[in-house]
């Protein structure tokens, strides 16, 4: 019989990293939802974690949340206003695909097992959202995440 392997971690680091690493083997980064970290910042974090430690991450909110979302304002995201409707809700747009490429760039450093795509409450079920999500996920590269 196969044994299930369960990993338990937190969303972010609620205590110092050195203390966290003594207890947990994985973390889910929430910061990546608000802003994509710089390459240098991502490499610094990756170099701080134990070799077998798993860094999972949330995808950048511009892919899943519309530009009118309060979380965009909180994150201070600036975009060309004429393209605002092209972001969020997993729309299969150039802007969302470019944002996903930025997520992948950081994911190549962290090597997560999971990239969480958090959708807002306003992303309800309807035919358009389903069509957009299907096309988005059929188009993007996963790179084994």
Regions found by a protein language model. Name each.
Residues 1-145:
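Residues lining hydrophobic/aromatic ligand-binding pockets adjacent to catalytic sites
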């Amino acid at each position: 019989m196969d044994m299930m392997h369960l990993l338990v971690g937190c969303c972010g680091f609620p205590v110092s990293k050195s203390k966290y690493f003594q207890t947990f083997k994985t973390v889910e980064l929430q910061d990546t939802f608000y802003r994509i970290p710089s390459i240098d910042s991502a490499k610094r974090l990756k170099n701080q974690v134990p070799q077998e430690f798993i860094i999972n991450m949330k995808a950048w909110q511009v892919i899943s949340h519309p530009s009118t979302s309060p979380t965009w304002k909180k994150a201070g995201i600036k975009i060309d206003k004429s393209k605002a409707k092209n972001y969020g809700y997993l729309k299969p747009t150039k802007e969302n695909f470019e944002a996903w490429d930025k997520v992948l760039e950081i994911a190549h450093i962290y090597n997560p097992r999971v990239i969480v795509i958090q959708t807002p409450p306003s992303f309800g079920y309807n035919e358009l959202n389903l069509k957009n999500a299907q096309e988005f996920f059929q188009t993007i590269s996963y790179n084994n995440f």
